[in-house]
């Protein structure tokens, strides 16, 4: 009788299992991709069409946002190493799967309400609108990356430590972290424009 051999699961960075991660926010669950891959590098396959970045692994989207600063521009291997080291720090501090911490951070850092400018006879009037789920995810990842950059640029704190602290604080909903503070600010402005 032959034994069935199941294919080994592909773990992110050969360590983290994405299948055990649950996304608690149902609004963004469709746009946070958790397909398993060893190295989060899609080689630009998902950038040619408009909404295909929803199919990109959320970790790779974070890596791509970290590459946008002038120090890390185009250095994907450096950004991958930063995220891998930050995930190790997150796991040491929280004893949780860091991908789940990242998903919670994205859910807590994305603004639910924003403002747009409407022009009435030469006068700009702010109007509050609900944020689309894909924009929530994009904005959250961008705010997390901006918070990491502001916490580590021209400072002695390593980038991996800054990313780990930002992810943990955003996952807990701490208003002292950059991304959640910016989300609160945007929602406060939107609330005043209702």
From Swiss-Prot:
Keyword flag Ribonucleoprotein: yes
GO CC field: small ribosomal subunit
SUPFAM superfamilies in the cross-refs: Ribosomal protein S7
PANTHER family given in the database record: RIBOSOMAL PROTEIN S7
Subunit structure: Part of the 30S ribosomal subunit.
HAMAP family membership: Ribosomal_uS7_A
Primary role: One of the primary rRNA binding proteins, it binds directly to 16S rRNA where it nucleates assembly of the head domain of the 30S subunit. Is located at the subunit interface close to the decoding center.
UniProt name for this protein: Small ribosomal subunit protein uS7
Lineage: Archaea, Methanobacteriati, Methanobacteriota, Stenosarchaea group, Methanomicrobia
Gene name in the database record: rps7
């Amino acid at each position: 009788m032959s034994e069935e051999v199941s294919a080994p699961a592909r773990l992110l960075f050969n360590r983290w299992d994405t299948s055990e991660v649950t996304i608690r926010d149902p609004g963004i669950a469709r746009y946070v991709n958790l397909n398993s891959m060893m190295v989060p590098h899609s080689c630009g396959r998902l950038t040619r069409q408009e909404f295909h970045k929803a199919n990109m692994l959320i970790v790779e989207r974070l890596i791509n946002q970290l590459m946008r600063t002038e120090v890390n521009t185009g250095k994907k291997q450096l950004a991958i190493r930063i995220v891998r080291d930050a995930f190790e720090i997150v796991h040491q501090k929280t004893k949780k799967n860091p991908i789940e911490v990242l998903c919670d951070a994205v859910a807590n850092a994305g603004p639910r309400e924003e403002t747009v400018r409407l022009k009435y006879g030469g006068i700009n009037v702010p109007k509050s609108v609900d944020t689309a789920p894909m924009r929530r995810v994009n904005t959250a990842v961008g705010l997390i990356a901006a918070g990491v950059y502001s916490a580590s640029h021209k400072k002695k704190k390593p980038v991996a430590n800054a990313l780990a602290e930002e992810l943990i604080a955003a996952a807990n909903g701490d208003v002292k972290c950059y991304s959640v503070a910016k989300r609160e600010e945007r929602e406060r402005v939107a609330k005043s424009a209702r």
